């Protein structure tokens, strides 16, 4: 079944935002471990190694703040799911290093706001 034009636009917009954040994090010295890491609990947009920490990154891309700040869309339920996603990742790797949960906001003008330890 084909995607509606609106869903396709959102998917393309989100993918572009994730690429932009991945490039930003690489410039900061991070190593991208996984993109769009899927589990039964949901998907982590990016998982990155930042020195001795693993960051699970939720990327929010918006063309406006009409519906609030992008980070406001990371609800308590989404935060719980991200923690379950992290558990799946640790089981897969057989280790549990220092972890944090970050949120990246990407705006249509290319601006990125990055929040370490967002939740």
Residue positions per predicted region:
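Residues at secondary-structure transition points
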Residues: 8, 12, 16, 41, ...
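Domain-level recognition of nuclease-like catalytic cores that cleave nucleotide substrates
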Residues: 92-119
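A short acidic/basic microdomain associated with nuclease active sites
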Residues: 26-40
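Short acidic/glycine-enriched loop/turn segments that link adjacent beta-strands
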Residues: 40-42, 109
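Positively charged, solvent-exposed patches that mediate nucleic-acid binding
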Residues: 37, 49-50, 71, 87, ...
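Short, charged, amphipathic alpha-helix that recurs within catalytic cores of restriction-modification
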Residues: 73-93
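Conserved catalytic cores of phosphodiester-cleaving nucleases, focusing on short active-site segments
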Residues: 44-65, 70, 82
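Solvent-exposed, charged helical/coil patches
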Residues: 1-28, 72
């Amino acid at each position: 079944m084909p995607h509606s034009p609106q869903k396709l636009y959102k998917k393309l917009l989100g993918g572009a935002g994730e690429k932009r954040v991945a490039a930003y994090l690489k410039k900061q010295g991070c190593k991208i471990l996984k993109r769009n890491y899927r589990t039964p609990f949901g998907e982590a947009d990016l998982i990155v190694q930042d020195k001795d920490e693993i960051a699970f990154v939720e990327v929010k891309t918006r063309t406006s703040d009409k519906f609030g700040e992008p980070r406001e869309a990371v609800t308590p339920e989404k935060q719980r799911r991200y923690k379950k996603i992290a558990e799946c990742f640790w089981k897969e790797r057989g280790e549990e290093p220092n972890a944090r949960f970050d949120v990246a906001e990407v705006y249509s003008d290319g601006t990125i706001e990055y929040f370490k330890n967002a939740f």
